[in-house]
Amino acid sequence: MSLQRTIKRKIDQAIAAGDILAIKNLLPLINKALDRPNNLILCSDAYKYSHHKFYPEGTEMVHSYLESRGGKFETTVFYGLQIYLKEFLEGIAITAEDVDEAYDYLGDEKGVFGRNDVFDRTKFDYIVEKHGGKLPIRICAVPEGTVVNTKNVLFTIENTDPNCAWLTNFLETILLQVWYPITVATLSREVKKIVIKYFQKTTDYDAATIDFLVQFVLNDFGFRGVSSVQSARNGGSAHLVNFTGSDTTIANVVINDIYNSKFRGAGVPATEHSIMTIKGEEGEIDMMRRTLLQFPTGIVACVSDSFDIFRACSQYWGGELRDLILSRPAEPGNQLVVRPDSGDPAMTLKEVFKILFDKFGYTTNSKGYKVLPPQIRVIQGDGVNINSIAKIYAMLDVLKISAENLVFGMGGKLLQADINRDTQNFATKASSVVINGVEHDVVKSPTEIDEHGNFIKSFKKSKSGRLKLVKTKDGYTTITSKDAGFDLAKDELIPVFENGVILKEHTFEEVRERAIVRVEELVTVKEVY
């Protein structure tokens, strides 16, 4: 029976008996259920419940680590571990009721395994009885927001109770999910490099102004394109490590509750097709006028392709409504943002800008790039991914159109469709064990066959020994306990969790500060992935 159902049954019994004290005694369980709706014991791969039988007798400690083994991007932004620590591991992670529920699914012939000799509930009972349900685990990690080149250790995990050596890698399943916010934050940051590059090349703004404006260039449109609210929360917050624009409001809850920050992703009033088509094709211009009148100041966006984006730009925005648009305050932050939403993104934008420049005029900045009047801009939110953004900017560059005229909305390609665990080849592996008091290195080094039939060593080779992440002039490197100077080397991995207690929390502002794109990174910006 789940913890939630157990609580409900006990509350019903207490109410029937008029036993108020019994209800008060349930408060710890109620708080656990509210904080932890998922049973941690069930948050692992089925095969892991058998591992206690495979470890050699006398196994006292297992030391494992997380790394990106290399992938699409050369660096990763470490972000999101604090989410999983707070939501799954902190405090009382396992209760007696959790163990009972897990046994219902795993413990006997009617369970997952169809046998009663796989799941050993005494392993979990021991944690409840000996440690009060707190996990005897130590985790050290690089500070969140740190940009680390791939093929380096990002966190280590080991058990602190020799009777719980099996627990280290049992937690792999839930902790490895950190690949998701890391990869979203990394992708978002790579887009940011491209945006900064073109702002520096095509605008007249100084560095501080570019830093501010770029915050609003890539907007998260991804909520509807992900598989769950949890994905929207975690992935949406990862995007906000780099940018400020977002329609994924739920991401702010993570920032507030997990990262102790009042930072908010910024959104703007905007229409959708249900609004623009509500009066039919003939009434589209009326809805456009209404959009301008409802929000005469500030930013307002209007989807304009319900029937004909080119007519909308030439006859409506650039014709009958032109003077109303230009009557908006000329100060930044008061523009109408025209949104095409169909067709080839680059070719559509090329024609849209041609029409808008013709109807509204433009100025030419000191670098020779065209700039629309401050009252009107364009957003592209359809068909947007890192490659199409680079392609669009390259086209605008050729056409001498300044990057400041355009912002982007990126949906499923930001939070789901273009990323998975193998985007950066994330893995958690054991690297060191202690058996009967003796430390041993652990390593995997597969031999594989490539597409040409050649036998080669796999990129999946793991690291061995106890690990440290060391900062160098070129970034970071991982050293092992076999390397000379290991004991004296400064480890960038800091203790963040031990025995149920979070030892170090990062604020969202600290995370964003560490993830800032550095000037030296802009010397060569990759645009094709």
Functional labels for PLM-detected ranges:
Residues S2-I11:
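Short amphipathic alpha-helical heptad-repeat segments
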Residues L27-F73, K110, T122-P136, C140, ...:
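Buried, small/hydrophobic-residue-enriched core segments of structured protein domains
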Residues H63-K130:
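N-terminal, Lys/Arg-enriched amphipathic/low-complexity engagement segments
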Residues K32-E87, G91, F243-T244, T248-V254, ...:
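Gly/Ser/Thr/Ala-enriched C-terminal appendages of enzymes
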Residues Q13-I23:
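Charged, low-complexity interaction regions
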